[in-house]
């Protein structure tokens, strides 16, 4: 059985890196810093760049913090989990996607599907657009207008099956789909994501 990816969330507002969710560290209740987190943890370049570019000297006017989601290929497996957004939302924090170019169609799918996601920052958003989005988010407004291609439900389920290691013949049996139609959906999935299924699978954690 595949191990369920961790939903542990740590704060990046200071060097203490306190755990915020699912179990909040005791010292969090005495902290006066705004709670910001990047999830999943581990992308040091995103963390450093994001803090320096978008979080320093910016005031969050809301009572709850923000989880900025590293929506990139290595973390793809997490985003084919049907419950990932709902699980993070249980933290009480606002959810914002930081999407790379390849996963934009999947990010757009989740923007349409989930009302738990307050915003999205695309890889090609320029500095002005990024700053405008952050201002909207930190003043209680949404910044989740999508642009670009979007996976449909069938393509999402097909991606989920492939990521889970299920073969084409197994997918035919599980989803009762004609194999010719399956290959058509597979080709469309490849065109939207810009990579073959084999390359996609080989680049995830």
Regions found by a protein language model. Give the residues of each.
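DNA-contacting interfaces and partner/effector-binding or oligomerization modules
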Residues: 1-113
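Short alpha-helical
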Residues: 45, 128, 188
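DNA-binding alpha-helical recognition surfaces that contact promoter or target DNA
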Residues: 52, 132, 160, 184, ...
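Output/docking surface of receiver
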Residues: 98-103, 109-137, 183
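The C-terminal output helix
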Residues: 134-148
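Helix-turn-helix DNA-binding segment
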Residues: 144-184
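Basic, Lys/Arg-enriched C-terminal extension of HTH/homeodomain DNA-binding domains
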Residues: 190-205
């Amino acid at each position: 059985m595949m191990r369920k990816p961790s939903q542990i969330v740590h704060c990046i507002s200071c060097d203490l890196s306190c755990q915020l969710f699912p179990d909040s560290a005791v010292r969090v209740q005495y902290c006066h810093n705004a709670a910001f987190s990047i999830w999943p943890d581990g992308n040091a370049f995103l963390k450093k760049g994001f803090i320096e570019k978008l979080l320093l000297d910016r005031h969050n006017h809301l009572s709850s913090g923000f989880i900025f989601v590293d929506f990139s290929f290595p973390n793809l497996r997490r985003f084919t989990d049907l419950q990932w957004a709902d699980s993070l939302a249980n933290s009480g924090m606002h959810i914002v996607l930081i999407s790379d170019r390849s996963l934009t169609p999947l990010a757009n799918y989740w923007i349409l599907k989930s009302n738990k996601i307050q915003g999205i920052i695309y890889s090609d958003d320029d500095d002005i657009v990024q700053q405008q989005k952050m201002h909207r988010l930190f003043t209680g407004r949404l910044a989740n207008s999508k642009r670009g291609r979007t996976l449909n439900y069938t393509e999402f389920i097909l991606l989920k099956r492939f990521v889970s290691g299920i073969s084409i013949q197994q997918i035919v049996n599980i989803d009762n789909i004609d194999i010719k139609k399956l290959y058509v959906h597979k080709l469309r999935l490849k065109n939207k994501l810009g990579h073959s299924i084999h390359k996609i699978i080989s680049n995830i954690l």
